[in-house]
């Protein structure tokens, strides 16, 4: 738990040193999808520690790219919008917007709640083990989200 908190604090300190341009991606995506930009930041922190060049390779055909860790299972769907794995990796704002798109789908399907945030990572399967993963992920993102909000609170 201490390691998690240390990681959160370290990345939060780093996160607030980003240029205005980087923050604009979260702010714009949040505005356009009606999602708190800080929630998007919390998801990005949980997914990649805010690393826009993150790659999580499970196998040649199963991998996730970028700050929001967009999974390869979504690439066929995204291709109809002209979004490619390369654009998700090289265009930070495209990656953040795509993450916001999938989070918005979860909110539309299940409402704005932490289990919906968990669906971003663990999907919508009704199997008990998937529900447990959703709840765990939602709780982790909630913790990060609250840390972000506490950092912004007036002192």
Which role does the model predict for each range below?
Residues 1-2, 152:
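Short hotspots in intrinsically disordered terminal tails
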Residues 2-12:
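Sec-dependent signal peptide recognition
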Residues 3-4, 21-23:
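Proteins with a high burden of low-complexity, intrinsically disordered sequence enriched in S/T/G/P/A and R
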Residues 12-13, 22:
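N-terminal leader/targeting segments
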Residues 13-15, 59:
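Exposed boundary/loop context
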Residues 17-19:
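N-terminal signal peptide c-region/cleavage motif recognized by signal peptidases
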Residues 23-155:
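Catalytic glycan-binding domains that act on GlcNAc-containing polysaccharides
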């Amino acid at each position: 738990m201490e390691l998690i908190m240390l990681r959160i604090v370290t990345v939060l300190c780093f996160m607030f040193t980003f240029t205005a341009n980087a923050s604009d991606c979260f702010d714009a995506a949040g505005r356009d999808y009606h999602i708190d930009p800080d929630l998007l930041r919390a998801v990005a922190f949980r997914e990649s520690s805010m690393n826009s060049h993150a790659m999580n390779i499970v196998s040649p055909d199963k991998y996730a790219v970028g700050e929001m860790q967009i999974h390869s299972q979504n690439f066929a769907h995204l291709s109809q919008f002209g979004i490619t794995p390369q654009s998700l990796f090289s265009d930070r704002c495209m990656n953040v917007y795509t993450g916001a798109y999938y989070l918005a789908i979860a909110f539309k399907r299940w409402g704005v709640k932490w289990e919906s945030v968990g669906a971003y990572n663990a999907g919508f399967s009704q199997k008990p083990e998937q529900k447990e993963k959703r709840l765990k992920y939602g709780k982790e993102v909630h913790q990060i989200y609250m840390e972000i909000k506490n950092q912004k609170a007036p002192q």
